[in-house]
Amino acid sequence: TQIELYSPAKGLSAHQWFSARMVGLPWVQTIGASTGVIIAMTSPTSMEEPVNWARVMKHEFVHVLTLQQTNFNIPHWYTEALAVRSEGYPRPVEWNGLLLDRVPKGELKNLDNLSMGFIRAGSQANWNFAYCQSVLYAEYMVERFGEASLSKLLDAYRRNRTTDQAVPEVFGVDKADFEKGYRAYLDKVVADIRKTDDETEKKPNQIEKNYEKNKDDPQAAAEYAQLLMMIKKRDDARTIVDAVLEKHPKHPLAAYVSASMLVRDEK
């Protein structure tokens, strides 16, 4: 796969060169993009704010894989769902806020119009929510139909199936039932967010006691590691959080604590 990085030149910024390469205009909303054949990105050293360029590159490379696997027949929402899911990061707090606001109101896209949420978003929030809804479709598929359902849907698109054809073929239910299940899944996600938000803040001694009683509990260990980090016992925090991530590499709080310490190490 050809990878292109753009830097400032001839009075134009790196992002302007990248944008011109991708859309023929001096501005595009993102900093990295894939056509399915190449990956282009604004040079990380040319950005005003730090960016996880490895995360961006992985995301775009998944687009290359899924677009080529399906002969470019994959819907926009599904290639984004798989690309975001491959990053392996917890759902952003901003997305949780959008879910809390929009799911109860029923302000949602569905399989028929979700791709338009990227093409004609109308606002940054709508654009972010399109990503959020897309990856939650993938998570819903895994929970209800199993991990293999993701690759089965890819294969259906490879065989030139439309989404209307692919859903009953891959999942064994009609589209209405599939969408109903997705809506129920979103309700559960929102309930989980509210439950987390409603939990009272634990006192330091409670966190420590909970960890001492439940050292094999990844959440208890991650909370204690976060506490140790905050009181400057970074070596102890790192030992505990590394042990959690070794067994649970995608644990949200452990990943956050580990990343926070790495950022502080760089300062």
Walk through the language-model features, giving the residues of each.
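Acidic helix/loop microenvironments that form the catalytic cleft of cell-wall polysaccharide enzymes
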Residues: 80-88, 148-162
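Juxtacatalytic substrate-recognition/specificity segment
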Residues: 1-75, 86-95, 101-108, 112, ...
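Beta/coil-rich, acidic/histidine-enriched accessory regions frequently appended to metallopeptidases
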Residues: 123-129, 155-267
